Amino acid sequence: MQPRRIARELALLALSQLPQKPERLTTQDLQSVVVAAVRTLAGEAQDALETAAMELKRGRDRLLASEIQAVDVQSSRAMVTEAITLAETAVNRLGMVLDLPEFVQLANQQQVRDFSLDILKQVLTHRTAIDHLLETALVDWQFNRLAQIDRNILRIAVAEILYLKTPTQVTINEAVELAKRYSDEDGYRFVNGVLRRTIPHLEAQAQGT
């Protein structure tokens, strides 16, 4: 796992936990929010393990039921298929959980937290300008009507490009990865499209500064 990718994820989680008017938050307040985000991830790992265990148990129960309750081959096949689906879901969930210990360990590193704080500070300091820039790039959408998670992913990306000087393509790729993990099924395509339409506005603003 890349430390900066984890820092972005922490910043995203932290943004969702900020109050409605975060302008007066101190650096110490932001640090506390980042710590809370790390704890949230640890809690997610525990929840995912418990859910996977329940799915495996349900899958096992369906297999047993297929042997005892099925009245014909078709109903037995349906029960077995459901059991396999539950098992596959549990395995996929466990695969995600296996990454979390490394994630949490890296998230506790100072350089990761520092970069998260840099992102948060830039987003909060320039939030009005960032939101206005994104609004101009949207087609048939209002920025404040987007899902909160998508708004925050876009804000992080613009803040990185404009104020932290992260290469544009790297930033877009990282924003897409965040959207794949946290947005809905088509969220990553939407985020990618908005950011690509935002590039001319970003370049114009960069030349004007």
UniProtKB/Swiss-Prot annotation:
Keywords of this entry: RNA-binding, Transcription, Transcription antitermination, Transcription regulation
SUPFAM superfamilies, per the entry: NusB-like (SSF48013)
Domain of life: Bacteria
Keyword Nucleotide-binding applies: no
One of the protein's GO biological processes: DNA-templated transcription termination
Coiled coil: none
InterPro entries: NusB-like_sf (IPR035926), NusB_fam (IPR011605), NusB_RsmB_TIM44 (IPR006027)
Molecular function terms, GO-annotated: RNA binding
Pfam families assigned to the protein according to its UniProt record, in alphabetical order: NusB
GO CC entries: cytosol
Annotated family: Belongs to the NusB family.
Function, as annotated: Involved in transcription antitermination. Required for transcription of ribosomal RNA (rRNA) genes. Binds specifically to the boxA antiterminator sequence of the ribosomal RNA (rrn) operons.
NCBIfam families: nusB (TIGR01951)
Protein name: Transcription antitermination protein NusB
Organism of origin: Cyanothece sp. (strain PCC 7425 / ATCC 29141)
Lineage: Bacteria, Bacillati, Cyanobacteriota, Cyanophyceae, Gomontiellales
